Every structure is written in structure tokens, then in C-alpha cells.
Amino acid sequence: MGERRKTRQAEVNIGMVGHVDHGKTTLTKALTGVWTDTHSEELRRGITIKIGFADAEIRRCPNCGRYSTSPVCPYCGHETEFVRRVSFIDAPGHEALMTTMLAGASLMDGAILVIAANEPCPRPQTREHLMALQIIGQKNIIIAQNKIELVDKEKALENYRQIKEFIKGTVAENAPIIPISALHGANIDVLVKAIEDFIPTPKRDPNKPPKMLVLRSFDVNKPGTPPEKLVGGVLGGSIVQGKLKVGDEIEIRPGIPYEEHGRIRYEPITTEIVSLQAGGQFVEEAYPGGLVGVGTKLDPYLTKGDLMAGNVVGKPGKLPPVWDSLRLEVHLLERVVGTEQELRVEPIKRKEVLLLNVGTARTMGLVTNLGKDEIEVKLQIPVCAEPGDRVAISRQIGSRWRLIGYGIIKE
């Protein structure tokens, strides 16, 4: 067992989504043993700001047949058998962090929508996160009705009916609703079995050219490190197709900004992979699933503080095109999501500035042209994306960016 565990990488990414304080991080801890809020400001404010990843092994007990994430069955004490390793993406539920949640959503193969039983459903971010899943086309959804320890049976049933009503007509209409207490670990086995039943590992072709979406980037050198001990910049993200190997030459697009004739342009860069980390282990090869850390020969100055977030990594010459402007086939929602009162979505106007999320990248787009169900936008920061990719569209309403629909990239 120990040997297999060493080389094991998560094979599926599952998003934890839902309203702030409904228990996403607590549930991630119940499933993985890892508290994903490790950013100092997060611990102080008690909310998730950056996206957290934590892996768990799904295991089944051959004796009683129940599922858990522990090597010894918590129900009968028998040794459990490994089924697969999954990675949980803990996405921020706070409204100001919605664009971060969208970046994480682009890496999800399925999602657990956490809804607290002790509050009326839906709350603004519950609605907003479900809309985000709808926009990225995510259908593999489980609903965890959390905090049932705080309500009586009547209240829990009333909340269940509200959830049923809320998901009617959405991608989550047929999602199982599982009552749990993340705090006390109650019914977690039922939730783990639902993950097995409703969130399959996607079929992937390892021979496709590799493509990794960058979510974070770091300078891992401590201040005062002597020059000969400095290591190159590290990129953190998720491989969405193909595989990466230590020693591979990689290209990063759109790359790094430089100034030319008073305009900011971007230049793709190439470098070499010197190390790979997956599931907390150094590995020689990394595949889709989980968060992968890619050690490079890049100057760490380029990667510090998430500067490379939103880039795409692949083999030189094999990456999708970089776009300075996009033509989008637009699908607007009827109502703005995330606001306390429901507002109608007004049509997009020429010269309007929109916030666009493409994969893990986010950029501003100035609307230069309008057609029937189509817009053209000039991008502030170029993006690397395929024709046919989905783009989440947000508009500034009051002081916040609000999700108003999505676009599909046209040639």
C-alpha cells in the first residue's frame, strides 16, 4: 500500500462551492484532514481568499461496504481498500472573490455545493456559484446540506424543500442532496459514496499535447538565500490534458509583459521543467488531476506573488492561440446573480468595459462591436484560449463585479 501511495496523483478535481460560512473549508478538512485556509489574512478573517487544494484517498471497506477517506474503517475497524485519489478545490464563497471562484471552476471535474441547513436557501453566493457551474457547463454536482446539527428535523425538511425548489430547472436539478454535519463528521460516508457515484474520473487521452492552466505562481526562495542556492520560479496549476515530464521544454503563453512604443505587449517564454510536485510528492511525470507544482529555470522575479496566474503551459508551438481581442457568441442570464435584490440583466452596450474569465485568466474587455447575440471585445491583457472555449462575463454593478452570462469564443 505504501509504495502505491507514494506515486499516486489525484485523478479528479472536485470543487467545494457555496455561500461564505456555509462550511466548505470545514467539509474539506473532514474529508482530507487538511485545513485549506493557510493564507495569514484568511486565518484572521476566517474566509478563503486564495484557492486551496487538498487531496484525499477514497477508500471502501471490504467488510461492511461503507466508504471513507481513512485507511481503517471508522465504522467497523477493518482495513479499507484504495479506490481513487481525488483533489478538493476549496473556492472562496465571499462575493468580492467571485472571480477567484471562477478561475477555480475552470479546473473542476465536478462540484459539491455546500448549503447550510440553518439559513434560508438560496443565499446570494449559493445562487451565484450554481450559476457559475451552469456557465462552465458543469453537470456533475452533489449538494451537501451542512450544519444539520444546528436544526431540528422539521427545519431540516423545510430547508430541503427550499433547496429542491431552488435547483429546479438548473444543472443541479437531479443532484443528490445529502444531509451532513462537517463539524461532527456525520454522514460523511454517504457523501463519499456519492462522490464515487456522481463524479466520475473523466476519460483522458495521455497522448494529447499537454496543457496546464496556471492558477498560482511563486518565488520559493527565502530572503537572504545565497545566489548559488537560488531556485527558479514555480508555477502552480492543474494539467487539463496530456502529461508533463521533468526535463520537458515548455512554452508559457501569453507570457510576460513588456513595453513597446508606449503600449504593453506580451511575449511568450520558454523554459525547462526542473522538478514536478503532485500530491505533496516529487514526481517524474504529472497528469491531469490535483494541483501540480512545476519548478522551472525562470527568474523567480517573474513568478513571485502569482504574477504568472492565468497563463497556459504546454509544449512549444503546440499551445492555443493568444488573443488581443475576442469575438464572442453571447448568452446572457435573465437576472443578475449575487445581489440581494434580483435585477434584470440589461443588454451589453458598445464602449462598456466587462470583466472576462477565460480558464484561470481574467482580463478586462472593452466592447468595440455589437451584433445579434455577438460582441467584439478588445482585451486589456491578452489570453491564450481555443475557439469554442467558454468565457464568463461579469459587469460592474454598484461596487462589485456581477456575473451576467457567458460567451463562446468564435474564430
Swiss-Prot record:
Binding residue positions for GTP: D21, H22, G23, K24, T25, T26, N146, K147, I148, E149, S181, A182, L183
Annotated spans, G4: 146-149
Cofactor (UniProt): Mg(2+)
Superkingdom of origin: Archaea
UniProt entry keywords in alphabetical sequence: GTP-binding, Hydrolase, Initiation factor, Magnesium, Metal-binding, Nucleotide-binding, Protein biosynthesis, Zinc
Family (UniProt): Belongs to the TRAFAC class translation factor GTPase superfamily. Classic translation factor GTPase family. EIF2G subfamily.
PANTHER family, alphabetized: EUKARYOTIC TRANSLATION INITIATION FACTOR 2 SUBUNIT 3 FAMILY MEMBER, EUKARYOTIC TRANSLATION INITIATION FACTOR 2 SUBUNIT 3-RELATED
UniProt name for this protein: Translation initiation factor 2 subunit gamma
Record organism: Pyrococcus horikoshii (strain ATCC 700860 / DSM 12428 / JCM 9974 / NBRC 100139 / OT-3)
Lineage: Archaea, Methanobacteriati, Methanobacteriota, Thermococci, Thermococcales
